[in-house]
A protein has these predicted regions:
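Structural alpha/beta core scaffold segments of enzyme domains
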Residues: 1-174
Length: 174
């Protein structure tokens, strides 16, 4: 069958457009094949979009740290388990290095804080749930995990959370 596909070039490649296996293209082609000579415009309803779209990856963070008598961090250990959004895609060779998806770990593997005895470990979960990004990638979950834990440390040290964060920043930070 001969079909002409007119794509709207707009924005980035987010949502369904970011995945080579997106089924909306096949759906539009099948409709067009059933209606020869008739232009077809496929628009999913919000409900179809939610049911047919991919999911945001579930991520588990386990963060531990040690503080001294003055509340200063003396060691930081962060383990993260989650499914990569890039492994298995055309972007894998560009973004995944040594098995680590940079978009998944951003904000945890490179915190703005000067943390002594810092250790970060990531494990890529393998399960059958299809995942993609939703408005953000790593920072959406790593920011919450890191900053919530810094709040816990400030509380344990009986210090103001903002002052505690400022003390964790490297000298000369803005």
């Amino acid at each position: 069958e001969k079909l002409t596909l007119n794509m709207l070039y707009a924005g980035g490649s987010f949502g369904r457009r970011s995945n080579a296996s997106s089924d909306y293209v096949v759906e539009a082609a099948r409709i067009a094949a059933a209606l020869p000579g008739t232009p077809v415009k496929l628009v999913w309803t919000r409900e179809d979009d939610m049911a047919g779209g991919y999911y945001r990856p579930t991520v588990l963070h386990k963060v531990r740290a040690g503080i001294d008598g003055k509340g200063a961090v003396v060691g930081w250990d962060h383990v993260m388990v989650g499914k990569s959004i890039m492994i298995g895609t055309a972007f894998e060779t560009m973004i995944v290095k040594d098995g680590v998806d940079a978009t998944t770990v951003e904000g945890a593997s490179d915190t703005p804080y000067a943390l002594p005895a810092y250790r970060f470990e990531v494990h890529n979960a393998r399960e059958g749930v299809p995942v993609l990004w939703w408005r953000s990638v790593g920072h959406s979950h790593t920011g919450f995990a890191v900053e919530s834990f810094v709040d816990e440390l400030a509380h344990a040290a009986k210090q103001d959370p903002l002052a505690y964060r400022r003390a964790l920043l490297p000298a000369g930070s803005r």
